[in-house]
């Protein structure tokens, strides 16, 4: 992290402002996660596959790194300053304390959003490879297993049965996201095709934001899944303090992708 400087934040001396020169890496994919960040000045690139594929370019007000802090504990992407940049650094222990006192449904949402982001990153890597198809697998000891363990251990959600893609689309169009507990499906995004099984997350970021689910889904073997009511989850999120609301908003923005509408999450609670 050569060239990176830290100093107390003028607005909150308990936190640090981090200055990152253009081209310098703040953290790399696979690093242990000990903080999240909010861009104050400049631009930050978020990339996967050892920095070879850029997922997003973040500007002032955007948050990043929260997914690893609350979900996987290890960085899922590489953050590099696209220009000279200044970021507010928020330690993992602060975020952990905020989440530990939050309602159980919020903890469930964080774990499931982490899985959805890992899934999105994997599909993005397929789309930019020669293969064009792959299978998202929850690997033992990996970040997805950590998030799945947290989700399945604490879940008290209702379960639904879907025999085909139409049944899944009906759930999503009714504002319910699905987290697969058994069965198998194929998700198609553009030219990329991805097989998914246990731990697949469909539409959570979308129902929180109140925006359409754009991917096509085929059921390969009948699916049982937990359902998350988007309106109920959003109502809970909207009552959070501004800091945690911003974390959820940033999370959803990463999952939906650069340039996509944040829908009702674009508004800020008073």
State each model region's role.
Residues 1-270:
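Cytosolic regulatory regions built on CNB/CRP/Popeye-like sensor folds
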